[in-house]
UniProtKB/Swiss-Prot annotation:
Substrate binds at D33, R57, G79, R136. The gene is aroK. Pathway: Metabolic intermediate biosynthesis; chorismate biosynthesis; chorismate from D-erythrose 4-phosphate and phosphoenolpyruvate: step 5/7. GO terms for biological process: amino acid biosynthetic process; aromatic amino acid family biosynthetic process; chorismate biosynthetic process. Its cofactor is Mg(2+). Its EC number is 2.7.1.71. InterPro entries: P-loop_NTPase (IPR027417), Shikimate/glucono_kinase (IPR031322), Shikimate_kinase/TSH1 (IPR000623), Shikimate_kinase_CS (IPR023000). It comes from Pseudomonas aeruginosa (strain ATCC 15692 / DSM 22644 / CIP 104116 / JCM 14847 / LMG 12228 / 1C / PRS 101 / PAO1). Binds 1 Mg(2+) ion per subunit. It comes from the Bacteria. ATP binds at G11, A12, G13, K14, S15, T16, R117, R153. This is Shikimate kinase.
Length: 172
């Protein structure tokens, strides 16, 4: 089976929905950020502190290339994975891409107390999320086969909508 690749902003529910999708479809689930942390033996904030965002993005690109080369997985990506052209090409070629859209207001609510998000550990995280969304939303849409709204929706309903929408797509 082709991979299902979840893209979207932080706080959209990629990991939660990805696990549920994988269970429903009897597929393996991989979270690219968690895979990077396991390989490095360090968390994302530490990698950002030591290697900077560029160093982290290099690791991310290598991980996405590896994960997308396999088949039959649900893959949750980091929110910034779409920023590199090479990543977008890998993701697009690596399977069906589902953009989990969340409004900035919901992103703020879902990430407010999460200290594991280096890009938000600055003054005015709400403005940071607005700026990131303005930059990334067109890139998520560029590679998405399906766009699904996650605001005010239980994860199981989002999973059902994803499955219904994917069934309606022509085969690749």
């Amino acid at each position: 089976m082709v991979n299902l690749i979840l893209v979207g902003p932080m706080g959209a529910g990629k990991s939660t929905i990805g696990r549920l999708l994988a269970k429903e479809l009897h597929l393996a689930f991989k979270d690219s950020d968690k895979e990077i942390e396991q390989r490095c033996g360090a968390n994302i904030p530490w990698i950002f502190d030591v290697e900077g965002e560029v160093g982290f993005r290099e690791r991310e690109q290598a991980m996405l290339t590896e994960l997308c080369a396999a088949d039959g997985m649900v893959i949750a990506t980091g929110g910034g994975a779409v920023m590199r052209d090479g990543n977008r090409q890998v993701l697009r070629a690596g399977g069906r891409v589902v953009y989990l859209h969340a409004s900035v207001e919901h992103q703020i609510a879902r990430t407010a107390r999460d200290r594991n998000r280096p890009l938000l550990q600055k003054p005015n995280p709400g403005q940071i999320l607005r700026d990131l969304m303005a930059l990334r939303d067109p890139l998520y849409r560029e590679i998405a086969d399906v766009v699904v709204e996650t605001d005010e929706r239980p994860p199981r309903l989002v999973v059902q909508e994803i499955l219904e929408r994917l069934r309606k797509l022509p085969p690749r």
